[in-house]
Amino acid sequence: MKAKRSHQAVIMSTSLRVSPSIHGYHFDTASRKKAVGNIFENTDQESLERLFRNSGDKKAEERAKIIFAIDQDVEEKTRALMALKKRTKDKLFQFLKLRKYSIKVH
């Protein structure tokens, strides 16, 4: 029974590979979409907020406002988003520390 399971695992792992060379296809980079500077250029603020909110972001509204701020250049937006991420991370660490100490007290 074990051998059968391992055989199934081997078949499953090879069928789940995403490499085009297994199937005889090659990547054609000429037909790929070109990269854009602003990936949010064709979206509005509400749909971006909804996207962030649905992905579990607690600060979806603030993050969308930062992205759609007209008066900021790219570097300022990047710094603002990184600061928002750091604040969220710091709050998480504060929460975990408080939780750790509250467990020791009880």
Curated annotation (Swiss-Prot):
Its main location: cytoplasm. The keyword Ribonucleoprotein does not apply. GO terms for biological process: apoptotic process; cellular response to heat; endothelial cell activation involved in immune response; negative regulation of apoptotic process; negative regulation of Notch signaling pathway; positive regulation of non-canonical NF-kappaB signal transduction; positive regulation of protein kinase A signaling; positive regulation of protein kinase C activity. It is found in: Cytoplasm; Nucleus, Nucleolus; Nucleus speckle; Nucleus. One of its GO terms (molecular function) is Notch binding. It comes from the Eukaryota. Ubiquitous. Expressed in thyroid papillary carcinoma. Expressed in liver, expression levels decrease in hepatocellular carcinoma. Slightly detected in normal lung, its expression is highly induced in lung cancer cells (at protein level). GO terms for cellular component: cytoplasm; cytosol; nuclear speck; nucleolus; nucleoplasm; nucleus; plasma membrane. InterPro entries: Avpi1/C8orf4_dom, Tcim. Signal peptide: none annotated. Keywords: Apoptosis, Cytoplasm, Nucleus. Induction: Induced by pro-inflammatory cytokines such as TNF and IL1B, via NF-kappaB signaling. Induced by cellular stresses such as heat shock, TPA, lipopolysaccharide and UV. Induced by mitogens such as thrombin. Pfam families: TC1. Seems to be involved in the regulation of cell growth an differentiation, may play different and opposite roles depending on the tissue or cell type. May enhance the WNT-CTNNB1 pathway by relieving antagonistic activity of CBY1. Enhances the proliferation of follicular dendritic cells. Plays a role in the mitogen-activated MAPK2/3 signaling pathway, positively regulates G1-to-S-phase transition of the cell cycle. In endothelial cells, enhances key inflammatory mediators and inflammatory response through the modulation of NF-kappaB transcriptional regulatory activity. Monomer. Interacts with NOTCH2 (via ANK repeats), the interaction inhibits the nuclear translocation of NOTCH2 N2ICD. Interacts (C-terminus) with CBY1 (C-terminus), TCIM competes with CTNNB1 for the interaction with CBY1. This is Transcriptional and immune response regulator. It comes from Homo sapiens.
